[in-house]
Regions:
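Acidic/polar-rich alpha-helix caps and helix-coil junctions
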Residues: 1-98
Length: 98
């Protein structure tokens, strides 16, 4: 809790953004990481780690090509392997679903 409040005090410039122990849960930490590490490229990995990228339990507008958002196939947890890499190394096989 103290570390989260330290980060929020730095960001807000005062303690107005501090939280209580009751507000600290996994969803809060995931959301805070999304804000704090916005340009660092961690969001997709975090969503995969917590099984939220492809599931329907966590949606955002236009997820899955639907305006209200929807779950998508689990194949999207992995990227396709480029054909140039597979041509260079015949031991590579394409990730499932691609």
């Amino acid at each position: 809790l103290q570390y989260v409040n330290n980060v929020r005090t730095r960001a807000y410039g005062n303690t107005s953004g501090n939280i209580t122990a009751g507000q600290l849960n996994l969803q809060f930490i995931l959301d805070e990481r999304g804000r704090e590490l916005y340009w660092e490229g961690h969001r997709r990995t975090d969503l995969i780690r917590y099984n939220l990228l492809t599931s329907g339990s966590y949606v955002w507008p236009w997820k899955g090509g639907v305006s209200s958002g929807t779950g998508v196939e689990s194949k999207y947890n992995l990227f396709p392997i480029p054909s140039s890499a597979r041509n260079s190394n015949p031991n590579l096989s394409q990730n499932p679903g691609f």
